[in-house]
Amino acid sequence: MGQRHKRLFEEDGVEFIGVADTTAEATALFKRIKSGELTPDFAVVASPAVTHDEYVKKCIKMKLPVLVEKPVSISGEDALEYQKHALKRNALVFVGHSERFNPAIEEFAKTDFCKEMQGCLKSWFLQKQDVFPICFKFTRTHGFSPRNRDVSVEYDLMIHDMDLLCSFVDKNAMLYKSLDCVELSDDRVHAIYDFRTLKAEFIADRNSASDARTVEISMKGRSVTLDLGAYRNGNPAYALQHEHQAFLNYLSSYKNAALDEDSAYDWYRDFYDACYAVVLVALIGELYKKGRANEIDAK
């Protein structure tokens, strides 16, 4: 994945002044940056997920803007810490959830259905209604692949869809109530989350006989289905390029702005969403894999 990022950034005119393929090389590279020998405009972290914590912390501490591959962390607690420290230190952290830039997602965001859905969620939240008027169902399956085997299926596949949900829905409407894991293994998860004003079902399988990337949304007797793996015009946009452009745009505005809690920029809201997605996915490990399914804390 790192080579793909490098190649596409270089096509946009970005020059890489340092590349690390091992932990030792990364350590040496950070030392050169800290000493002032190297003065990069930003860093890209596309290493195994278990190393993201270490590298993101270093970037935040140095206030070095960073694009980090998903997931930003495999710990809900660490994700919350990143969110706090990034805000406190005014450090730009951009998580590489390229699915946000899928053409199907971008087009759906422009539809009347999407705007009505977001309006209803806000209205129901303000009225303090505890109902499930809107239901999401995310399905993401594919055959066996040796990639990303350093993390379980929820951090490999399901995290994409949880991030999409967080980017679709205002956080006030996502007050967590309960979680039910219908099925859970290292390669397959079927989980249902109940929030205050919506229900979200996730099916992710990385050892499946079929390939699927769909989002189904039901509201007021109507429904829409998004096929994230198909493009009607026959000319699929390269989501990773759109992701890079969004990061570079954020980087440009970041250099000329001051961040505070009352005026968070779009890039910070995106980072908050990515961190919240990790927190919600982490509940599976905390509540089920550790045998604490009956200790759900709505906080």
Residue spans of the language-model regions?
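Conserved acidic residues
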Residues: I17, D41, I134
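C-terminal helix-rich "cap/oligomerization" subdomain common to oxidoreductases
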Residues: R32, F42-S47, A91, N249-K299
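A contiguous active-site-proximal alpha/beta segment in oxidoreductase catalytic domains
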Residues: V50, S73-F144, E295
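N-terminal Rossmann-like dinucleotide-binding module
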Residues: M1-T27, I33, L248
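NAD(P)-dinucleotide binding in Rossmann-like oxidoreductases
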Residues: V182-D187, F195-L251, K255-A258, D266-D270
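Beta-loop-alpha module in the N-terminal Rossmann-like domain of NAD(P)-dependent dehydrogenases
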Residues: H5, T23-H85, H97, I105
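Rossmann-like dinucleotide-binding domain that binds NAD(P)(H)
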Residues: T141-S210, Y272, Y276
